[in-house]
Amino acid sequence: MQEIEIFCDGSSLGNPGPGGYAAILRYKDKEKIISGGEKFTTNNRMELRALNEALKILKRPCHITLYSDSQYVCQAINVWLIGWQKKNFAKVKNVDLWKEFLEVSKGHSIVAIWIKGHNGHAQNERCDSLAKLEAQKWVKTTT
């Protein structure tokens, strides 16, 4: 299986409010950037949207190392998700996106690594800037 790195970040202005997401996918010396946003959302939803949209791009099963400054996303992938499924996602927020994650992550092996946000990690900083730009686009449509 191919080794892929995914860096992702989500932003929400107001939380909830206008939001944006960005992800960088790296394979060897190739890089792909994706981004987008929504009119009314949360930072956690945008973080998860970034990951899901990145996974949709992959055409074959991969070993994925995910880097995120979201403890929510990293803990969910590495620890909580199995328990959530056993309890049929009772009291879990963003169930729609977690169920989508389960679908788009099928066949992949994913290890999520938490990185401290706003701490000079180049790819995280890039994703953060792109996600904020996407969120700003939606501010103009809500005023």
UniProtKB/Swiss-Prot annotation:
Entry cofactors: Mg(2+)
Catalytic activity from the UniProt record: Endonucleolytic cleavage to 5'-phosphomonoester
One Pfam short name: RNase_H
Details of cofactor binding: Binds 1 Mg(2+) ion per subunit. May bind a second metal ion at a regulatory site, or after substrate binding.
Protein localization: Cytoplasm
Disulphide bridges, residue numbers: none
InterPro entries, per database record: RNase_H, RNaseH-like_sf, RNaseH_domain, RNaseH_sf, RNaseHI
Top-level taxon in the UniProt lineage: Bacteria
GO cellular component, one term: cytoplasm
UniProt xrefs under CDD domains: RNase_HI_prokaryote_like (cd09278)
Keywords: Cytoplasm, Endonuclease, Hydrolase, Magnesium, Metal-binding, Nuclease
Role this protein plays: Endonuclease that specifically degrades the RNA of RNA-DNA hybrids.
Similarity comment text for this entry: Belongs to the RNase H family.
Subunit structure: Monomer.
Protein name: Ribonuclease H
